[in-house]
Amino acid sequence: MSKLADLRQEYARAELSRDHVTDDPIEQFRAWFDEAEDAELEEPNAMTLATAATDGTPSARIVLLKGLDDRGFHFYTNYESRKGTDLSQNPHAALVFLWKPLERQVRIEGTVERLPAEESTEYFHRRPRGAQMGAWASPQSRVVDSRADLEENLDTVKAEYGDEDEIPRPSHWGGYVVRPTEVEFWQGRPNRLHDRLRYRRSDPAGDWTLERLAP
């Protein structure tokens, strides 16, 4: 820990200019994501999700991107978790993707909506069976006395659904879509003069403005 102030890395892998990007940030994200996959990065769909309660108290955690379309960025969780509670009170969020070997970040801000129930159900049934049971067994973000309590909950779920061909989706579990109003692409550059290109719009249905930000 004594060397924290001396930890640094020079970035010189690539550059980013207006000539390098598309007019649509969703398409630009897809292009960068494909490059992250081609580079065989571990879990390139891992992203920081930041939410805030109505009093402004923030919270952040790593979740996985599980879908992307013209509406925005999809993830799934327990609606009664800390993030679910935050989003029910304050439907705004920020996402950050870090692809360190490529010296890249993508930062997203936007409004958040629940995905339609049928989409959540379809994705739920594509999950491993154990993960489906876990969604029933875990009272996410609540205090539990011990790990044994969780295992007991799981045993109860197995007893109820173990012989069923299909486990129903819990009503407290499902998907969200972050509808972006701002998307920033960051490329590391020498001397900390990084490239930052930001797309922004005033509402999720508006036109995009592209601008360069100082690092």
Curated annotation (Swiss-Prot):
Its EC number is 1.4.3.5. It catalyses: pyridoxamine 5'-phosphate + O2 + H2O = pyridoxal 5'-phosphate + H2O2 + NH4(+); pyridoxine 5'-phosphate + O2 = pyridoxal 5'-phosphate + H2O2. It is an enzyme of class 1 (oxidoreductase). Pathway: Cofactor metabolism; pyridoxal 5'-phosphate salvage; pyridoxal 5'-phosphate from pyridoxamine 5'-phosphate: step 1/1; Cofactor metabolism; pyridoxal 5'-phosphate salvage; pyridoxal 5'-phosphate from pyridoxine 5'-phosphate: step 1/1. FMN binds at residues 61-66, 76-77, 82-83, 105, 140-141, 186, 196. Belongs to the pyridoxamine 5'-phosphate oxidase family. NCBIfam families: pdxH (TIGR00558), PRK05679.1 (NF004231). Catalyzes the oxidation of either pyridoxine 5'-phosphate (PNP) or pyridoxamine 5'-phosphate (PMP) into pyridoxal 5'-phosphate (PLP). This is Pyridoxine/pyridoxamine 5'-phosphate oxidase. It comes from Salinibacter ruber (strain DSM 13855 / M31).
